[in-house]
Amino acid sequence: ASDVYKRQNLAAVIDPGDEPELIQEALEKEGVEVRYLLLTHGHYDHTTAVPALHRVYPQADIYIHQADANGAGSTLFPLTGEVDDLKLYDEGDVIRLGDHEIQVLHTPGHSPGSVTLKVEDVLFTGDTLFAGSCGRTDLRGGSYEQIMQSLKRLGELKGDFHVCPGHEATSTLERERRSNPFLMEAMRS
């Protein structure tokens, strides 16, 4: 699964996990200039299409959090050795796309370098927050305590947001505050 955030004929592709040809076809149909490939974390199901897309869009900067940039050869982190010009982002960084700002929130737990990308009233949560659930923490580098802290942080954001997770259905933050058992538990702590 991947998301495309577009503004003023510019695009950021978020978590291009597979099917680079379909992503490219959609981007060409939209007639946008791809500026960024933004990764919420480094697992293969969010990064597999990156090398192919970067060959087509070499001008696009690839961003990932430092904690997931060095995959140490794990099959979960296939970018290691395939893409050598990764740019690193961290908590508080801002990526500009036209006149819009994409804010980086470090939300570890699913992986050490998991981030949520906040832009306008949208949260691209990767595998941190799902509709009705949260990402698994039993993979290498995962931490239940950290994901609960990250969920609490997201739940405490002021206002409502559209939630675009890395898998399954979209939601709203307000709906998740009322019905997601993991988010509700995190906010009680």
Language-model features, listed with the residues they occupy:
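Active-site HxH/HxHxD metal-binding segment of metal-dependent hydrolases
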Residues: 18-100, 178-185
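Short, flexible loop segments at the rims of nucleotide/cofactor-binding pockets, characterized by
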Residues: 13-14, 39-40, 83, 105-106, ...
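Short, small-residue-biased leader/transition segments that mark boundaries at the very start
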Residues: 1-5
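Metallo-beta-lactamase
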Residues: 7-16, 30, 74-79, 101-106, 111-189
